[in-house]
């Protein structure tokens, strides 16, 4: 069985993606249904959703939305790599909430859009 570990879904009617305005070629919806049709055709059996750098206020909604899709009959969604902002003051509480959710398999902080000081600082070492 093939496992796709890096699926991005975009639903602009449900979540905000500020960065899409600067990338016209990607500024459209990418649905699970379209993905599933193609993935099954080539033998993908399971998939992990990789966060899509939604607006910070939508981070938990993105995880919940993908988890909801995973409950559909025949869904290949096995988990989510959730977005995170370790530099935010409420990160510890966010992390505890997400760690309680078995659907969350890991975390990613998009770094190419923030100053290097963030990834080189203590917050990423601690």
Q: Predicted segment positions?
A:
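An N-terminally biased module of ancient metal coordination in phosphate/nucleic-acid-related enzymes
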Residues: 1-67
């Amino acid at each position: 069985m093939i496992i796709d570990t890096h699926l991005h879904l975009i639903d602009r009617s449900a979540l905000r993606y500020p960065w899409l305005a600067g990338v016209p070629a990607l500024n459209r919806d990418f649905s699970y249904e379209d993905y599933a049709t193609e993935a099954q055709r080539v033998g993908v059996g399971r998939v992990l959703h990789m966060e899509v750098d939604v607006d910070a206020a939508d981070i938990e909604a993105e995880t919940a939305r993908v988890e909801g899709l995973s409950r559909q009959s025949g869904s290949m969604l096995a988990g989510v790599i959730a977005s995170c902002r370790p530099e935010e003051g409420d990160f510890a509480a966010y992390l505890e909430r997400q760690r309680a959710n078995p659907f969350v398999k890991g975390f990613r902080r998009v770094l190419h859009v923030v100053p290097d000081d963030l990834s080189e600082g203590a917050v990423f070492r601690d």
